[in-house]
């Protein structure tokens, strides 16, 4: 039979939101949607085989490629199968493998790596398939448990209420398995979870992290999450490799960079903001906090060809660096990610530092007053944009103001969330208030209210003491006062009563 061109309408490409038209021709196939400017084309030279199965929107024609991720075309009806078999046979001289997915609902089976996919089989039928390129991170979360983290959509036009995404999966891999030893060629027993983890990690590097790293940094100290990591930086992503955890971070997920000197004058921190955050089990890390010794130098050469450096990274990065380590790392991050590095604003503490020491709950740290935000480090790292702050309250709880050497600072955001930072030295109050006023942030000073209340209470106490003394004086008996005799009382009420003087005189006369 002669080859022919066939068109199918309302077909979705790789779970696209809107459908398009699929055209199958002798040279390959193409897909075009009104919502996209450029069509998707696939030449016959890249196609390995075709698969047919039940899918999200009816039936799917899955195309397995020789060197890339599989292509999913769904939206077909069951009646389209016979026509597709004939067209693909005529144009490509290939058949269509019909697959039935397991619908038993079992949560145990076999995990196999097939090309660029991880396939979970139940009774020799696939239960689900995961493109390895979608795995951004994998970690051993237990002796026999492997955690897989997946990339999330970056389409911010889709309302969050309409987006349900798989972000993490955990697989329990029990027992041991045999692995050939590269040294002597003999098979050795190895923990099955470890082998699965190493295999997945190796395959997950295929894709955007493929090729040689542009630059690598060794033994970089991270305060959050705690540990030392090797950082490999590629064209569009970086990898953090630690003793326990490995992470892959897309540059597109880096939303902020901060370079901040610590008050101890010996260290400098470089903070990397992430969205979505890094995950370790149930713990999320929206910020990576790295720390460098101020006097430590670093010398590196970038693995970039001179022509590429001039064309793609002109005025962004240099071919080589030999300067303080914190400057080298921050400048390379700025050049490769395209993000601005935020440094301290004009704020200076009482001791001339860019931050004030304080505590958030039970954690001690530093609060930086930046041009457009306030940042608390290291743990937990909290960022409060100036535009989101409704008011700041100064207070001192649990101690009289006159005796307090520290005070608390509470930030209230438009969302209703509040953050209280305590144990701030009293000498920092004037500088903080002046900075808040310069940013036109509403300030509620409970310290002044408490001071006035203390003075009023003290005045009332003094008045009470004076009143008590007057009352005591009124009620107490005069020491110079002597009570009169009963005769004095009689003289006052009885005119015939003899006075004591008369009695004394008559007595004297009688004696004479």
UniProtKB/Swiss-Prot annotation:
Keywords: Chromosome, DNA damage, DNA repair, DNA replication, Nucleus, Transcription, Transcription regulation. InterPro entries: PH-like_dom_sf (IPR011993), RTT106/SPT16-like_middle_dom (IPR013719), RTT106/SSRP1_HistChap/FACT (IPR050454), SSRP1-like_PH1 (IPR048993), SSRP1/POB3 (IPR000969), SSRP1/POB3_N (IPR035417), SSRP1_DD (IPR024954), SSRP1_sf (IPR038167). Forms a stable heterodimer with spt16. The spt16-pob3 dimer weakly associates with multiple molecules of nhp6 to form the FACT complex. Interacts with abo1. Component of the FACT complex, a general chromatin factor that acts to reorganize nucleosomes. The FACT complex is involved in multiple processes that require DNA as a template such as mRNA elongation, DNA replication and DNA repair. During transcription elongation the FACT complex acts as a histone chaperone that both destabilizes and restores nucleosomal structure. PANTHER family: FACT COMPLEX SUBUNIT SSRP1. GO terms for cellular component: chromosome, telomeric region; cytosol; euchromatin; FACT complex; nuclear replication fork; nucleus. It comes from Schizosaccharomyces pombe (strain 972 / ATCC 24843). Residues 460-512 are annotated as: Disordered. One of its GO terms (biological process) is silent mating-type cassette heterochromatin formation. GO terms for molecular function: DNA binding; H2A-H2B histone complex chaperone activity; histone binding; nucleosome binding. SMART domains: Rtt106. In contrast to the orthologous protein in animals and plants, this protein does not contain a HMG box DNA-binding domain. This function may instead be provided by the HMG box of the associated nhp6 protein in the FACT complex of fungi. Disruption phenotype: Sensitive to methyl methanesulfonate (DNA damaging agent). Belongs to the SSRP1 family. It is found in: Nucleus; Chromosome. It comes from the Eukaryota. This is FACT complex subunit pob3. Residues 460-504 have a biased composition (Acidic residues).
């Amino acid at each position: 039979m002669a080859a022919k061109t066939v068109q199918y309408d309302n077909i979705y490409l790789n779970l696209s939101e809107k459908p398009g038209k699929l055209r199958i021709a002798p040279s390959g196939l193409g897909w075009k949607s009104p919502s996209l400017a450029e069509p998707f084309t696939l030449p016959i030279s890249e196609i390995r085989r075709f698969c047919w199965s039940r899918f999200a929107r009816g039936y799917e024609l899955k195309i397995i490629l020789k060197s890339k991720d599989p292509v999913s075309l769904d939206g077909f009806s069951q009646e389209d199968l016979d026509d597709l078999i004939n067209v693909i046979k005529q144009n490509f001289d290939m058949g269509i493998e019909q697959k039935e997915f397991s619908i038993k609902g079992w949560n145990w089976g076999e995990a196999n790596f097939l090309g660029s996919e991880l396939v979970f089989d139940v009774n020799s039928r696939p239960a689900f398939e995961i493109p390895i390129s979608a795995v951004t991170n994998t970690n051993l979360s237990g002796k026999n448990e492997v955690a897989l983290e997946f990339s999330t959509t970056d389409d911010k036009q889709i309302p969050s209420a309409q987006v349900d995404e798989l972000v993490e999966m955990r697989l329990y891999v029990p027992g041991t398995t045999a692995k050939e030893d590269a040294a002597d060629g003999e098979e050795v027993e190895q923990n099955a979870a470890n082998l699965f983890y190493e295999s997945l990690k190796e395959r997950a590097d295929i894709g955007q992290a493929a090729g040689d790293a542009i630059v690598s940094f060794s033994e970089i100290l991270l305060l959050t999450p705690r540990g030392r990591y090797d950082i490999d930086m590629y064209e569009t992503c970086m990898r953090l490799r630690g003793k326990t955890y490995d992470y892959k971070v897309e540059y597109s997920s880096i939303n902020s960079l901060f370079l901040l000197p610590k008050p101890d004058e010996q260290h400098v921190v470089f903070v990397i903001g992430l969205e979505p955050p890094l995950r370790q089990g149930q713990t999320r890390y929206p910020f990576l906090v790295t720390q460098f010794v101020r006097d430590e130098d670093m010398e590196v050469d970038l693995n970039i060809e001179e022509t590429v450096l001039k064309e793609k990274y002109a005025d962004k990065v240099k071919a080589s660096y030999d300067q303080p380590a914190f400057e080298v790392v921050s400048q390379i991050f700025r050049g490769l990610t395209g993000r601005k590095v935020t440094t301290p604003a004009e704020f200076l503490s009482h001791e001339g530092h860019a931050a004030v020491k304080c505590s958030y709950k039970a954690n001690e740290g530093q609060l930086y007053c930046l041009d457009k935000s306030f940042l608390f480090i290291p743990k937990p790292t909290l960022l409060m944009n100036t535009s989101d702050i409704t008011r700041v309250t100064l207070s001192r709880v649990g101690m009289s103001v006159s005796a307090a050497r520290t005070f608390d600072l509470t930030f209230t955001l438009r969302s209703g969330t509040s953050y209280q930072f305590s144990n701030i030295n009293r000498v920092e109050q004037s500088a903080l208030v002046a900075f808040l006023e310069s940013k036109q942030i509403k300030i509620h000073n409970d310290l002044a209210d408490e001071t006035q209340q203390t003075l009023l209470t003290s005045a009332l106490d003094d008045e009470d003491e004076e009143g008590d003394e007057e009352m005591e004086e009124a009620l107490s008996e005069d020491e110079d006062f002597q009570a009169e005799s009963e005769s004095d009382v009689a003289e006052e009420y009885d005119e015939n009563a003899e006075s004591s003087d008369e009695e004394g005189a008559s007595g004297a006369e009688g004696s004479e």
